[in-house]
Amino acid sequence: MLRRNLLLSPLALCLPSVLAQAKGKRAVVVYFSWYDNTFQERIRPSDIDETTSASLKAPGQVALVAHWIGKDLGLPIYPIVVKDRYTTIYEDCLDRVIEEKTERVFPELTGPTALPEFDLLFLGFPNWSYTIPRALWSFLSKVQTANKTIAPFCVHGTGGLARTIRDLKSAAPEARLTRTLSIDRSELAESRKRALDWAQNIYFG
């Protein structure tokens, strides 16, 4: 059926999702963002200051990149969501993040509840206290990543990637990691093309 559709519709050859299916590529986009893990309806304008900036504005910085990639490649997109949501107050949120990191907490998750079979996982996250959010440890502990490929993308501030990739390798030791897409949040608005070039090179490579 796929072969017939491609023959009948030459324009379909231009669609990344169709090309991916033709190559047998199985991939998903999964991400963690602060915005998706707060009670959005409780966010007040006074909560959004220079520090929180776009992190608390819909759809969130990491989510924005995830949707760029997912929509461009025709992939399903899943947010990682914790059961116990985070506060919108930056300093209080940071205190909890540091505590979770120090105590090596595995936060309980409410999503994603299930994923389709995949060979390639685009995994997005912020730099949280110089490492990956502990929710990623929870997610990766429940997902089969042995012999899978993880393509990490991180939106960060002046701390850069810090220990995020080192700790990601520890959380998924049997996975293959691609080159990381690192985006400074101050350059996010101009980063769409770079993000898509990165994703397409991995996806169709």
Show which residues each predicted segment covers.
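N-terminal export signals
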Residues: 3-22
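Active-site-proximal alpha-helix that buttresses catalytic centers in soluble enzyme cores
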Residues: 18-205
